[in-house]
A protein has these predicted regions:
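Cell wall/extracellular polymer interaction/catalysis modules
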Residues: 1-181, 185-203, 210-226
């Protein structure tokens, strides 16, 4: 039976920032943002002043974005709102899948923990010695479809650099154009916030802004050989 972890991930890509990253013999488009991990089941998160309907509930926190310090207003669905941890976020750009921003009609995307063997095996095949064995979150109930009409597989998992991503999201600490081992450590910090990793734990993801996936291209051509 799935258990609720009382954790919400909040993703912002504003202002849009891309870079062209050399990975082996190719270059790949990277989209950088910020990921805030909140202890609490959030009903909403937004960058604005608390209006009359939100003035007496929730919590405001100062977070660091690519636009500098901003006030993030958080409202819990139930219970209290606890600590907030901040990470950089990394996604693949240049036409790859990006989750759309959440709306009042769809306030968040459900997440479920899993051990993904494709992620694990790709790290082992790529010679990455230190990884967390494919432990990740799967994004549920999102609108992105594959060409055959099946819901696309979007994960939140570790990634040393953008070459390990297609439509997925990785947290970490940006070091030039890479995360390095900070991505594995970031995922482990998130798992610690939810009381340790176990499969089928539930969490939430709130996406604050649109990714503009088709417009995000820093390389002359996606996956250009160099």
């Amino acid at each position: 039976m799935a258990t609720d972890t009382n954790i919400t991930l909040v993703l912002t890509r504003f202002p849009l920032a891309v870079s062209c990253v050399k990975t082996g013999k190719t270059t790949k488009d990277a989209c950088w943002g910020r990921l805030f991990v909140v202890a609490g089941n959030l009903a909403s998160a937004r960058f604005d002043r608390a209006g009359p309907d939100r003035a007496t509930d929730g919590k405001t926190v100062e977070v660091t974005t690519r636009a500098g310090k901003r006030t993030l207003h958080l409202v819990a669905e139930r219970g209290e709102i606890g600590a907030v941890r901040e990470f950089d976020s990394l996604e693949r750009a240049g036409g790859f899948v990006h989750l759309e921003a959440n709306t009042d009609a769809v306030p968040y995307y459900p997440l479920k923990t899993e051990i993904n063997f494709r992620v694990r095996d790709s790290f082992e095949a790529g010679g990455v010695k230190d990884h967390n064995g494919g432990r990740c979150f799967r994004v549920l109930k999102h609108p992105n479809k594959r060409s055959d009409g099946v819901m696309a597989g979007i994960l939140v998992h570790e990634a040393p650099h953008v070459g390990w991503l297609t439509g997925c999201i990785a947290p970490g600490k940006r070091q030039s154009d890479r995360f390095g081992d900070s991505s594995r450590r970031a995922m482990n910090e998130i798992f610690q916030m939810m009381g340790g990793f176990a499969a089928d734990k539930l969490a939430r993801l709130i996406v604050l802004d649109k990714g503009e996936k088709d417009a995000l291209k820093a390389c002359p051509k996606p996956d250009r050989a160099v």
